[in-house]
Amino acid sequence: MLTINATVRKEQGKGASRRLRVANRFPAIVYGGNEEPIAIDLDHNEVINQEHKSEFYADFVNLVIDGKATKVKVKAVQRHEYKPKITHIDFLRA
């Protein structure tokens, strides 16, 4: 199972998301199950390296959010129109 590290987002909105992307990070959301949705941010290089593996989309991913592991599945990926960049990911809890 793949493991990706994440941190909880303290700021939300267009400006905060743009600042994340300039810092080579991007926003994501974890939803589903009996818990509230969590807004997180991920390191772009770490995710791109994992994304090229087939189990990223086919299997569950171990998402470590501020030290707490959560089993999730990739539900949706949004990409930049012409740059090879991910702009947002939706994760669904197992």
UniProtKB/Swiss-Prot annotation:
Which pairs are disulfide-linked? none
GO BP terms: translation
Q: Which GO terms describe its molecular function?
A: 5S rRNA binding; structural constituent of ribosome
InterPro entries per UniProt: Rbsml_bL25/Gln-tRNA_synth_N (IPR020056), Ribosomal_bL25/Gln-tRNA_synth (IPR011035), Ribosomal_bL25_short (IPR020055), Ribosomal_L25_dom (IPR029751), Ribosomal_uL5_bac-type (IPR020930)
Entry keywords, A to Z = Ribonucleoprotein, Ribosomal protein, RNA-binding, rRNA-binding
Reading the lineage from the top rank, the first entry is Bacteria
On whether RNA-binding is a keyword of this UniProt record, the answer is yes
Instruction: Mention any one GO cellular component term assigned to this protein in its UniProt record.
Output: cytosolic large ribosomal subunit
Q: Which Pfam families match?
A: Ribosomal_L25p
What CDD domains does the annotation carry?
A: Ribosomal_L25_TL5_CTC (cd00495)
Q: Carries keyword Ribonucleoprotein?
A: yes
Regarding protein family, the annotation reads: Belongs to the bacterial ribosomal protein bL25 family.
Subunit details for this protein? Part of the 50S ribosomal subunit; part of the 5S rRNA/L5/L18/L25 subcomplex. Contacts the 5S rRNA. Binds to the 5S rRNA independently of L5 and L18.
Q: What does this protein do?
A: This is one of the proteins that binds to the 5S RNA in the ribosome where it forms part of the central protuberance.
Q: Which HAMAP family match?
A: Ribosomal_bL25
Task: Output this protein's name.
Answer: Large ribosomal subunit protein bL25
Q: Which organism is it from?
A: Proteus mirabilis (strain HI4320)
Output the lineage of the source organism: Bacteria, Pseudomonadati, Pseudomonadota, Gammaproteobacteria, Enterobacterales
* Gene name, Swiss-Prot/TrEMBL: rplY
